Design a protein with these regions (language model features):
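Active-site and NAD+-binding cores of ADP-ribose-processing enzymes
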Residues: 108-163
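Flexible, gly/proline-biased loop segments at the beginnings
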Residues: 1-123, 161-164, 249, 286, ...
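Short, well-ordered loop/turn elements at secondary-structure boundaries
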Residues: 96-98, 108-111, 129, 192-193, ...
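Noncatalytic linker/hinge segments flanking ATPase motor cores
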Residues: 76-77, 91-95, 99, 105, ...
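Extended, charged amphipathic alpha-helical segments
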Residues: 1-8, 12, 71, 140-273, ...
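Short N-terminal helix-initiation segments at or just after the protein's N-terminus
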Residues: 39-50, 78-81, 133-146, 171-174, ...
Length: 333
């Protein structure tokens, strides 16, 4: 709509928000999930640095991924070729990016000395089979020897080159949760607690009085807010000065609701019971037995994760990645 002309006396300006946009009718982020061929290697279908930053935007997402990593490391049986530290990096990359890379360190005699994880954020798959590159900003590409790198990836329905994380569907929920928190921080930092419309129809105040009132309202924001305002209007009308609050109570309710709904979305995507992440129940009955929840989660979620991580053994030709049975007894260091 055309912009309203400025300075029109007595004019009421209105505007409308855009119509809701259906996901299936728009070209959004996931419409571009294809791998662009960049000469010698393929580019990932989504920015990997963005995925890494997204995990730190929400406490439930970051805590849930860390919890899964910790449970995998807890049950992992160290091997002479792969220690717990290296496996921890491998598991974290797989959970965050939906893919992980493991490289072989070969001696001059051809003997396998060690397996070391390669950071998935900087790895690129080559155009030719078995080719992998490490790409970092400001540095030359490093090409690995053919067959020396193994890629463990989540299956995807759009392409077969890179993996995508299971939690990709809740990126919007995680960012909405962050936006709500940032809005609340700005709300308190800026002192925007004078959230109201001051509707004045009283003809009694003079121009100077209106300017003084406007200045007093402007000074009520920022540090030292919650000031009381005094208005004296002799012979004024009963409804000549009306205060219509619009933000404080509504903003609190929306903030709480957004935090709760987005948290539930993230927990559903990660498939972790809330009591395992230390979430305080809001109902009197609670979440039930945490021991039962941990046992069921280990059977339904941890065991399939362990099976996918153990697929590396098929590439190695020996049992390097193995896991101990899950139990609730502390594991000796």
């Amino acid at each position: 709509m055309p912009a309203p002309s400025a300075g029109t006396a007595g004019a009421v300006t209105t505007f409308s928000f855009g119509d809701p946009t259906p996901v299936l009718d728009s070209r959004g982020l996931f419409d571009y999930l294809e791998c662009w061929r960049n000469g010698r290697h393929y580019e990932p279908p989504i920015t990997l640095s963005g995925l890494s930053r997204t995990t730190r935007s929400n406490p439930f997402l970051h805590s849930g991924l860390t919890f899964k990593r910790n449970m995998l490391v807890r049950t992992f049986v160290p091997h002479r070729l792969l220690d717990r530290t290296a496996f921890s990096q491998l598991a974290l990359d797989y959970l965050v990016f939906g893919m992980a890379y493991l490289g072989r360190q070969i001696s001059h005699s051809g003997r396998l000395l060690q397996l070391h994880p390669l950071m998935a954020q900087y790895m690129r798959r080559g155009v030719q089979p078995g080719e992998f590159f490490q790409v970092r900003a400001g540095r030359a590409e490093h090409e690995f020897a053919p067959g020396s790198v193994h890629q463990l990836r989540e299956a995807d329905t759009d392409q077969e080159i890179y993996g995508l994380p299971e939690w990709l569907a809740v990126v919007q929920s995680a960012l909405l949760n962050e936006s709500a928190t940032l809005f609340r921080r700005r709300y308190y930092t800026n002192g925007s607690h004078a959230g109201f419309i001051l509707y004045m129809t009283d003809p009694q105040p003079e121009g100077m009085d209106v300017d003084a009132l406007r200045e007093a309202l402007r000074d009520s924001r920022g540090p030292g807010n919650f000031r009381n305002l005094f208005v004296h209007s002799p012979n004024g009308k009963k409804d000549g000065l009306q205060l219509i609050p619009i933000s404080e109570v509504a903003a609190k309710d929306e903030f709480t609701g957004i935090k709760r709904v987005t948290r539930d979305d993230i927990l559903a995507a990660l498939r972790i019971p809330p009591q395992l992440l230390g979430i305080v129940p809001q109902n009197a009955g609670g979440f039930g037995s945490i021991r039962d929840a941990a046992t069921v989660w280990a059977s339904m979620e941890l065991a399939p994760l362990q099976s996918r991580m153990a697929m590396v053994n098929e590439w190695l030709g020996e049992e390097v990645i193995t896991f101990a049975p899950f139990d609730l007894v502390p594991v000796a260091p």
